[in-house]
Amino acid sequence: MKVKSILSEGKQIQLATELVRLGARLQVLEVSTTLSRERLVKLYKEVKGVSPPKGMLPYSEDWFTGWQPNMHSSLFINIYNYITQYTNVRDIDAIIKSYQLYLEHIEVNHLQCILSFTRAWTLVRFVESKVLSVTSCVKCTGNFLVHSLDIQSNHVCGLCHVPSRAGKTKRAAAQKAKEAQEVEIREACAV
């Protein structure tokens, strides 16, 4: 009979709860904790109020190199690298702390959250397995993500070389229309 420590099981439940609250998928919970799948499903339902989503995890390193996802992914991986380099926080705890700081930055700057926790977890795995790597921009020297096997060496980040269609999303158009309407209202009230 296997002897289980109540304290260690409590820590695993606490970790799984934190991961669920951050939006981790069931597969991430299974890899990150020692709890059984059945207990994780029950915990997920208890925390979220719904069954965990089914299906495969997102698995495309190309997603991280698109303009907007690259900005958010680069921000996250730079936070993660800083935390792992200058603190004793490692593994899933480092991913959690980094993701919390990423979310805080997004909230403070009123930005749309592009990077989910599961994608952040996948990103760390891609960087650790050298599928993706961090390189410096030749213009601003900021660090950003690129494919590890890219032959080009003079990398320019998405902030220094913004694509022509950047920021032209439906959300940006709606925000622009809202701001224009607010200006019209202020001008009408000023008369």
Curated annotation (Swiss-Prot):
Organism: Nitrosomonas eutropha (strain DSM 101675 / C91 / Nm57)
Underlying gene: flhC
UniProt name for this protein: Flagellar transcriptional regulator FlhC
Role this protein plays: Functions in complex with FlhD as a master transcriptional regulator that regulates transcription of several flagellar and non-flagellar operons by binding to their promoter region. Activates expression of class 2 flagellar genes, including fliA, which is a flagellum-specific sigma factor that turns on the class 3 genes. Also regulates genes whose products function in a variety of physiological pathways.
Keywords: Activator, Bacterial flagellum biogenesis, Cytoplasm, DNA-binding, Metal-binding, Transcription, Transcription regulation, Zinc
Gene Ontology MF terms in the entry: DNA binding; zinc ion binding
Family: Belongs to the FlhC family.
One GO cellular component, as annotated: cytoplasm
Cofactor(s) demanded: Zn(2+)
Record flagged with keyword Secreted: no
Cofactor mode of binding and number, as noted: Binds 1 zinc ion per subunit.
Localization: Cytoplasm
